[in-house]
Regions:
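C-terminal alpha-helix
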Residues: 133-141
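N-terminal strand-loop-strand
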Residues: 1-39, 67
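Residue-level recognition of short, well-ordered coil/turn positions
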Residues: 125, 141-142
Length: 142
């Protein structure tokens, strides 16, 4: 899947394992955006990474999972959540149960879990922009 963007600040990726999403509980620290809320893997771009390279590196750093590009299902460019006037990339991918079972949780965040789509979309403990982006995907693939 080729994503045509050369200037972006970072990526988030919604990874579906069956009918659930892999989520990470952010640290409960003041001074970080959205403390103590559930979010999706991803983060800031390093160097001239492609969107997939950025997301894959972040997933490996956060969860110890190696992604391959054939896991990608969908992508869309959005305004950055952190940097006004900049863009970020949102990806949707699939994760196998074997990959989920092999997670080695890194040092960012308090924990991880598979969350149902309904809970992810309705919870007030999930980053709202990420809820909107998952909703966009679900609307488009109906």
């Amino acid at each position: 899947m080729e994503i045509e963007i050369s200037d972006f600040t970072g990526c988030k990726i919604a990874l579906f394992c069956g009918d659930k999403l892999l989520t990470i509980l952010r640290d409960n620290k003041s001074g970080i955006p959205f403390p103590n809320t559930w979010e999706l893997p991803g983060g800031g771009r390093e160097g001239d990474e492609s969107p997939f390279e950025c997301a894959a590196r972040e997933v490996y750093e956060e969860l110890g999972i190696h992604l391959t590009e054939d896991c990608l299902l969908w992508s869309k460019v959005y305004p950055s959540m952190l940097f006004e006037g900049k863009e970020s990339v949102f990806l949707i991918g699939k994760l196998t149960q074997e990959q989920f079972d092999s997670i080695v949780f890194g040092d960012e965040g308090q924990g991880y879990k598979l969350m149902s789509i309904d809970e992810f979309l309705s919870s007030d403990k999930v980053v709202p922009q990420l809820q909107d982006r998952v909703r966009d995907y679900l609307e488009e693939v109906k």
